[in-house]
Amino acid sequence: MLNRICKSLLFTAMMTGVAYSFAQQLPAVTYKNPTLPVETRVADLLSRMTLEEKVGQLLCPLGWEMYEIKRNDVFPSDKFKQLIKDRKAGMLWATYRADPWTKKTLSTGLNPALATKAGNALQRYVIENTRLGIPLFLAEEAPHGHMAIGATVFPTGI
């Protein structure tokens, strides 16, 4: 009798562990479940967003002020962290740009390797430090080539 009880308890514990393991692998919320249709995920995400978060997705601040380079690494700037906290911005424009307007140069701007690190650092910060973890939309203007260090710029007609 005692042997049956022990086996039953062991089986129950194992099944609980297996169920817990599967539960950890599945997204907890609908909008994060990649197996569901996009329309379902979008509707779920929009229903969870506050008005402030929805407006924040429409903001498009200048991105070249949103990172700091330290040695050979890139980190979100305090200005970026405050922007995300206060305004819930969902987009940055010209993060990788380097020209006289941005005051980014070969020594202060992002080369291709640092640009990758910057994009990853900014995305990681937003995903890990916002309520819903919505990734940033990083936009660049490139009508005649991308104005970034290590990029090709093509001549344009006057």
PLM regions and their residue ranges:
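Bacterial Sec-dependent N-terminal signal peptides
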Residues: 1-27
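N-terminal beta-rich core of secreted/periplasmic extracellular enzymes
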Residues: 24-158
